[in-house]
């Protein structure tokens, strides 16, 4: 599962098992199975929406079973399904303040005719319009060079808050932690998502 249609790198497909091994001992985790969330190409269209719908259903079910749920693999084409599954679950009721905290170099608020790894959080924010729950979105690690002016404009219009990569590097760590804690304290339910491109190339070459 790669992110080429979102103008990203193809997933080598080897990371999931290694992350699982590093995350927790085998007796403390359970594999809920694989879901293909595939954008495809012009020559071989994938069923991105179908995969997202299946993944959202699985996530909602796991959360309703009070299971800490982690989605691994691919790019942020899985993020819309994750947000959708969360708000469909019993964890979110009328008036619930949902927060999405994204560690990422990109906003992923792209306006596009088709969903991709670059569109999920704009989709989620639009879904929240008129919904009974509230949704806030914050990003740590934004690269000013890798987000267009239009994306910054969209972020401002949507009430998104962010810390740039340079701010995160030059600020006191305590200050960044305080900023994150302030966001977390203002929501009832938190969805944390991490895109590895938030890491410097020297730390994560090839991302």
What are these regions (language model features)?
Residues 2, 6-207:
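Conserved alpha-helical scaffold segments that buttress catalytic/binding sites
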């Amino acid at each position: 599962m790669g992110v080429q249609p979102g103008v990203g790198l193809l997933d080598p497909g080897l990371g999931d098992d290694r992350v699982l091994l590093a995350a927790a001992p085998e007796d403390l985790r359970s594999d809920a199975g694989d879901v293909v969330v595939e954008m495809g190409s012009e020559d071989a269209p994938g069923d991105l929406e179908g995969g997202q719908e299946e993944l959202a259903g699985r996530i909602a079910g796991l959360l309703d079973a009070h299971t800490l749920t982690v989605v691994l693999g691919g790019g942020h084409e899985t993020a819309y399904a994750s947000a959708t599954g969360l708000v469909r679950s019993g964890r979110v009721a009328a008036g619930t303040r949902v927060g999405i905290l994204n560690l990422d170099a990109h906003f992923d608020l792209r306006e596009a005719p088709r969903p991709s790894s670059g569109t999920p959080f704009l989709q989620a924010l639009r879904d929240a319009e008129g919904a009974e729950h509230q949704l806030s979105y914050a990003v740590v690690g934004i690269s000013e060079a890798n987000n267009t002016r239009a994306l910054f404009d969209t972020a401002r219009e949507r009430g998104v808050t962010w810390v740039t990569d340079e701010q995160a590097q030059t600020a006191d760590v305590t200050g960044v932690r305080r900023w994150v804690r302030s966001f977390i304290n203002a929501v009832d339910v938190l969805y944390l998502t991490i895109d590895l491109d938030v890491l410097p190339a020297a730390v994560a070459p090839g991302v």
